[in-house]
A protein has these predicted regions:
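Amphipathic alpha-helical hairpins
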Residues: 38-39
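Short Pro-Cys-Gly-centered "Cys-loop" motif that presents a nucleophilic cysteine in a tight turn
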Residues: 1-29, 33, 43-213
Length: 213
């Protein structure tokens, strides 16, 4: 476990807020589970997210070890990051994150779990840590309209296929988006960002072959 009591959650979130400001990372959604956490974030530069997480770890791990008289690392390996196609998946990821406590049977209603951004998006508690994404603002013209629309989206839940897709992408670090999105991203970062295509490569169409000049 990485969070054992309320103070652990509060201290972690305070350091996360400090680090997000320092390294210019916009936090759109989060959940702190007993043994892991999820963040939906937009860093201002390519190193912002990793620097933020390193800074938080350098502060939180010593605090946790002192408090519970333990030594060693707290996390199992480096954090995993997934690039997403915002237009297609951002709001789905937001709901996936905030419904995590429900899927884990910690609560029945996400509103009953205090350590996530759901209360902010649902309009029951403003959270200064959260930077509302433009796609959240697009849910309505007023805060009231946005909150009602978001609560309805969460009430609808996610399909089993959506949960599986997001879970696999998170655990494996694959980009989350269409094949065109992944292809464009691979050209930018010069590495594979999704699972390898199965099967043999297709044979060239004979009608497209050219005679050597």
């Amino acid at each position: 476990m990485i969070f054992r009591d309320d103070d652990d959650h509060r201290i972690f979130l305070a350091w996360l807020a400090d680090a997000a400001r320092q390294f210019k990372v916009a936090i759109h959604a989060y959940v702190l589970m007993p043994n892991h956490l999820h963040l939906l974030a937009s860093p201002a530069d390519k190193d912002g997210l990793s620097r933020m997480m390193q800074w938080v770890g350098r502060h939180y791990v010593p605090y946790f070890n002192r408090k519970y008289e333990r030594v060693g690392t707290l996390y199992q390996g480096r954090f995993k990051a997934t690039v997403i196609d915002s237009e297609r998946y951002l709001m789905t990821c937001c709901r996936y994150i905030e419904l995590n406590p429900v899927r884990a049977a910690l609560v029945v209603d996400p509103a009953d779990f205090p350590w996530s951004s759901y209360a902010h998006h649902a309009g029951t508690h403003s959270n200064p840590l959260i930077s509302d994404h433009g796609l959240y603002w697009a849910l309505g013209n007023t805060p009231f309209e946005r909150e009602i629309a978001y609560r309805e989206l969460v009430r609808q839940g996610l399909s089993a296929e959506e949960v599986t897709t997001l879970t696999d992408s998170t655990l494996k670090g694959w980009a989350l988006g269409s094949s065109q999105f992944r292809t464009t991203l691979e050209k930018t970062v010069q590495r594979r960002v999704g699972p390898a295509r199965r099967g043999r490569p297709p044979r060239p169409d004979p009608t497209e072959e050219r005679e050597p000049e």
